Amino acid sequence: MNIINLTPHAINFLREDNSVLATIEPSGMIARAAQTREAVGEVNGIVVNQCSYGAVTGLPDPQPETIYLVSALTAQACRDRSDVFITDDAVRDENGRIIGCKAIARI
């Protein structure tokens, strides 16, 4: 199975002992959901926006034996695609930074 990383970051998949099973480097393409925002009010001087997400750009057409890793926001915008996945079960270091994940998931 081909795994294509459509995010700007390398993704580490970790074993149960947190050793690295595989690292999927960025492909150089980034899939993104178009975003629109409209100011709808304010709270204590802070602007409140209404955001909506539309068409996805940068997502290749489905290919045999290929899955695509994208951001959760992008995956939500293309739920009809069975080949689009997000990282799941994040692992963090002692400072709270994500160092990898143990699974992938569909939205």
Regions found by a protein language model. Give the residues of each.
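Catalytic phosphate/metal-binding cores of nucleic-acid and nucleotide-processing enzymes, i.e., regions
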Residues: M1-I107
